[in-house]
Amino acid sequence: FISKYKAEQEIINSGLDYTIFRASYIIGKTDYLTKALSKQMKKGVVIIPGSGKYRLQPISVVDVAKIILEAINEKKFSKKILDLVGPQKMSFEDFVKLFTKNTSVKIQKTNLDSAYDEAKRNPRSVYGLESLNILVGDYTSDGKQLKKLSDVKLTTVAEFLQSSRLS
């Protein structure tokens, strides 16, 4: 995150017009998390590393596209740093339950240290090191600045899953 911060500072100090988006999990049919969960579902079991109580705040890729288009066309986004987050915070466990709703897929928790060991040993592990770090980092935001500037009605996870038939 230090390199991202340094890059932001370079942009801010450049004198250029900017809008910096700090993205949460961006979900769509082909994002990493969706693909990882879908792949696990085909095997009949979804693994939750650790307790699953850590939170995420996913945002729909369609909402992201609309917000970026708004930012390009509206000056009110100028010289802003915005947390690009969805409308709801939820635990990873609740996200997985929603994702697997109405299926016969089992949910199984695994020791977090074991998940990290597997990610270090196996480049094809279900969750990579970066994904684990982001997941357990519990990164959320109040999203106030985004709500204040954007006219986009953010899609809830349930709405997104239903409309995309991801679950």
Language-model segments: what does each one mean?
Residues 65, 96, 116, 147, ...:
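Generic structural signal for individual residues within well-ordered alpha-helical segments
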Residues 54, 85, 105, 136, ...:
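Short, flexible active-site loop motifs that bind/organize anionic cofactors or intermediates
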